């Protein structure tokens, strides 16, 4: 026989319905905070239970077991351990920015130590926790029955400060989680007031007063872009970094000292992780790690080897350990019974609306209470004005009910007024007592009028909220603990993990690039160029050599007017005998695009440093180096080229320097760079030389009166001329003759300034290359033809040349002779 109490259900439907019920219960009633008071149900019940127990800051601490037992029995039937753990967290300075529970005893440590059992510890409400419950007995919030309908509990607390932002929240529900960072109380209150004063305020405006989270453990927030995104959308991520300093011991060794760790980081686990990294040789240079923390604060010491770089080790620790972490914003909270991801403005708006409701309900409660009391006093005053008649009625009545009815009829009193008259003691009949009653009545009438005015004027409600927030700020606000590192990188770049060292970058004529340690290569000063290296093919030579640092930036300018940027360490390191890597493997060059110039941009480059551009068609431009601070991986346009023009070269000009430009037809113009005003990166430029028809620019150099001007013609003739024969004139002229151009010597192949003691590398269009010393080239006048520098095969022409420091000659082992065919 089938049991009538059994109900047949579809298992699939029942599972769906039951799981949804369970999920919503966890989401709404356990894991997520309410946007109004920032509390989950367990925290709200703990505070309310402590308030009902009278465990206030002015009373002695009470056993934690008594508190958790009372909360569990009346409001939260989910086990005492979960209640105690929540209460412990509210008493930990490293968990809550402003602790809501004042704990007495062992409440754990930031090293992950657990709190003592609840039978050993004691607790009471903190002073700021009182502000969460203030006026709760004035009908400021709604109450509901508890789980067994024997008690009443609040759905939300009045919360006289925005606790959701001030103390933050974390929680994992079903299919969703919340992670809201804590903030500084004073800054958060200022943000609330700013919204109230200016409803059109933007997130950027809010960040002027509330710049970012303020974690109880301090540490550093790297950059503000992640904060802005999180405040704007409710989701985002920031980088938290330990506060560190590098100390130098008496013996000259360095040590890293950590005084603040990121929020919720266990420094004992960090200690263990560092030791493991050292043992696995993933980090080298650490000799010892010890925790010297005490009651005065955190001090975590990492000893460094004498020859190791503390900065590099520190950056590796940031990358590999929790000394640097990411905090992911997910500002999810319950609003109107629904879980929502909220922006900063939405959280502030919700709190303001809650406070308006609290103030209105409290004002209404106070008004009703004052009106009730005034009603009684009004009756007493009527009785005192007719005291003889009142006494006669009372004496003539056989019962209280008869006397009350007669008083109500005679003096038009209410039941409450007549009862108050009957309850009045004889001493209230004195004249002094009447004056007191009259005074109290007048005060109540004034209070009622004021309360009614508050209810009628929203601006007064807003002012009360702001005044009360100011009071909370005055009592409990403190200095910010977390420092916001504005403009700092959000993550570690590779260069932070690479020790800075001086290196040489070489670029060959055929486009091979490599990095060499300066210890292996005798070089010019940083920024020098043109020293011949080794490892290139017989038909190749080093055209560009730059002395730089692994951390400095190199700018690569192409014939198409584009610029690319690499850091020194991004160029592969090769030995002296290796030819290097094709530069097209590092830079996204077009098929017909080639590197014309490599410029080293040092970190300490002066503010008046300019890049001077010269094009084939005589256009020049002067642009500040700062314009090239941010360059995308695929390059940027360095100048706007017109028609079929192309970039000849780029010069790094600092201070007051002259420029000389040479043309194919043998003319040169010299002018001061200040004759070209500074222009933006995308500007086209101005005319530097007025070219004759068919003429083009073949070279440009910086020039001083101590230099010599070297010119080489296409048919192998060349000469050196002292710079003083080239007077400084205005920009845009046709130029002065710098070479006698004939059919015999050919057009100019190039022009450059030299010191006179360099070697010269010359290459022809057939691939033949020669190296010769400049001393072999005669020094002649400006308008002469020059001497034969290189014997050419029939129909061959010189296409390019560059100088090579003579100091490198023996070391490199290249003879002053023609190398032969490519």
From Swiss-Prot:
Keywords: ATP-binding, Cytoplasm, DNA-binding, Isomerase, Nucleotide-binding, Topoisomerase
GO biological process: DNA topological change; DNA-templated DNA replication
EC number from the UniProt entry: 5.6.2.2
Enzyme category, top tier: isomerase
SMART domains linked: TOP4c
Keyword Metal-binding: no
Topo IIA-type catalytic domain span: 32-497
Subcellular location: Cytoplasm
GO molecular function: ATP binding; DNA binding; DNA negative supercoiling activity
SUPFAM superfamilies to which the protein is assigned, alphabetical: GyrA/ParC C-terminal domain-like, Type II DNA topoisomerase
Assembly description: Heterotetramer, composed of two GyrA and two GyrB chains. In the heterotetramer, GyrA contains the active site tyrosine that forms a transient covalent intermediate with DNA, while GyrB binds cofactors and catalyzes ATP hydrolysis.
Additional record remark: Few gyrases are as efficient as E.coli at forming negative supercoils. Not all organisms have 2 type II topoisomerases; in organisms with a single type II topoisomerase this enzyme also has to decatenate newly replicated chromosomes.
Family per similarity comment: Belongs to the type II topoisomerase GyrA/ParC subunit family.
Name of the protein described by the UniProt record: DNA gyrase subunit A
Organism: Streptococcus pneumoniae (strain ATCC BAA-255 / R6)
Classification lineage: Bacteria, Bacillati, Bacillota, Bacilli, Lactobacillales
Gene this protein is translated from: gyrA
């Amino acid at each position: 026989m089938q049991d009538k109490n059994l109900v047949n259900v579809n298992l699939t439907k029942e599972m769906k319905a039951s799981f949804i019920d369970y999920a919503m219960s966890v989401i709404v009633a356990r894991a997520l905070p309410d946007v109004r008071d920032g509390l989950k149900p367990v925290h709200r019940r703990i505070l309310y239970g402590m308030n009902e127990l009278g465990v206030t800051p002015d009373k002695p601490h009470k056993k934690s077991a008594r508190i958790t037992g009372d909360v569990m029995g009346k409001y939260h039937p989910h086990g005492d351990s979960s209640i105690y753990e929540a209460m412990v967290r509210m008493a930990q300075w490293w968990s809550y920015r402003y602790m809501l529970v004042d704990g007495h005893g062992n409440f754990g440590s930031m090293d992950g130590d657990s709190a003592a059992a609840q039978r050993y510890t004691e607790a009471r409400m903190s002073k700021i926790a009182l502000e969460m419950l203030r006026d709760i007995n004035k009908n400021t919030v709604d109450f509901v029955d508890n789980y067994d309908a024997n008690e009443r509990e609040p759905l939300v607390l009045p919360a006289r400060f925005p606790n959701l932002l001030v103390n933050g929240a974390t929680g994992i529900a079903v299919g969703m989680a919340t992670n809201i960072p804590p903030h500084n109380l004073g800054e958060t209150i200022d943000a609330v007031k700013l919204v109230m004063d200016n409803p059109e305020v933007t997130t950027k405006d809010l960040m002027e007063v509330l710049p970012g989270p303020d974690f109880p453990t301090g540490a550093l927030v790297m950059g503000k872009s992640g904060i802005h995104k999180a405040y704007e959308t409710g989701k985002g991520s920031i980088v938290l970094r330990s506060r560190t300093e590098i100390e130098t011991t008496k013996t000259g060794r360095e040590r890293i000292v950590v005084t603040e760790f990121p929020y919720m980081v266990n420094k004992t686990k960090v200690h263990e992780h560092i030791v493991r990294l050292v043992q696995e040789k993933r980090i080298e240079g650490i000799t010892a790690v010890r925790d010297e923390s005490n009651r005065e604060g955190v001090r975590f010491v990492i000893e460094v080897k004498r020859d190791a770089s503390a900065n590099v080790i520190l950056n590796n620790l940031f990358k590999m350990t929790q000394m640097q972490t990411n905090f992911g914003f997910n500002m999810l909270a319950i609003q109107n019974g629904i879980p929502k991801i909220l922006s900063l403005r939405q959280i502030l708006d919700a709190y303001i609306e809650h406070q308006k409701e609290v103030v209105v309900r409290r004002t209404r409660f106070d008004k009703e209470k004052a009106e009730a009391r005034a009603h009684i006093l009004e009756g007493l005053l009527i009785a005192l004005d007719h005291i003889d008649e009142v006494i006669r009625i009372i004496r003539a009545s056989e019962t209280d009910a008869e006397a009350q009815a007669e008083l109500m009829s005679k003096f038009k009193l209410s039941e409450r007024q007549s009862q108050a008259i009957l309850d009045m003691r004889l001493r209230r009949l004195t004249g002094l007592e009447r004056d007191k009653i009259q005074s109290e009545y007048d005060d109540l009438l004034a209070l009622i009028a004021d309360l009614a005015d508050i209810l009628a004027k929203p601006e007064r409600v807003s002012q009360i909220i702001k005044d009360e927030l100011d009071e909370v700020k005055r009592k409990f606000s403190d200095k910010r603990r977390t420092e916001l590192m504005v403009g700092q990188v959000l993550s570690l770049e590779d260069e932070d993990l690479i020790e800075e060292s001086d290196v040489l970058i070489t670029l060959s004529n055929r486009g091979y690039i490599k990095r060499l340690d300066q210890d292996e290569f005798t070089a010019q000063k940083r920024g020098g160029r043109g020293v011949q290296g080794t490892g290139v093919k017989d038909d190749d030579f080093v055209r560009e050599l730059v002395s730089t640092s692994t951390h400095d930036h190199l700018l690569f300018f192409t014939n198409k007017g584009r610029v690319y940027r690499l850091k020194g360490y991004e160029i592969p390191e090769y030995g002296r005998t290796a030819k290097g890597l094709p530069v097209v493997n590092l830079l996204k060059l077009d098929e017909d695009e080639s590197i014309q110039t490599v410029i080293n941009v040092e970190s300490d480059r002066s503010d008046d440093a300019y890049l001077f551009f010269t094009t084939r068609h005589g256009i020049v431009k002067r642009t500040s180096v700062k314009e090239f601070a941010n360059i995308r991986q695929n390059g940027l346009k360095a100048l706007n080229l017109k028609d079929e023009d192309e970039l000849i070269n780029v010069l790094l000009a600092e201070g007051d320097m002259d420029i000389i430009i040479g043309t194919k037809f043998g003319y040169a113009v010299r002018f001061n760079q200040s004759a070209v005003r500074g222009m933006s990166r995308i500007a086209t430029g101005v005319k530097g030389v007025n070219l004759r028809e068919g003429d083009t620019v073949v070279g440009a150099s910086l020039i001083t009166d101590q230099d010599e001007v070297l010119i080489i013609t296409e048919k192998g003739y060349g000469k050196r001329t002292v710079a003083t024969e080239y007077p400084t004139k205005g920009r845009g002229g046709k130029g002065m003759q710098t070479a006698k151009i004939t059919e015999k010597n050919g057009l100019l192949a190039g022009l450059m300034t030299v010191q006179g003691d360099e070697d010269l590398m010359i290459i022809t269009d057939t691939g033949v290359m020669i190296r010769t010393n400049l001393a072999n080239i005669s020094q002649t006048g400006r308008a002469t033809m020059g001497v034969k520098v290189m014997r050419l095969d029939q129909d061959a022409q010189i296409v390019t040349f560059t100088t090579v420091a003579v100091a490198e000659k023996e070391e490199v082992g290249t003879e002053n002779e023609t190398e032969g065919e490519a």
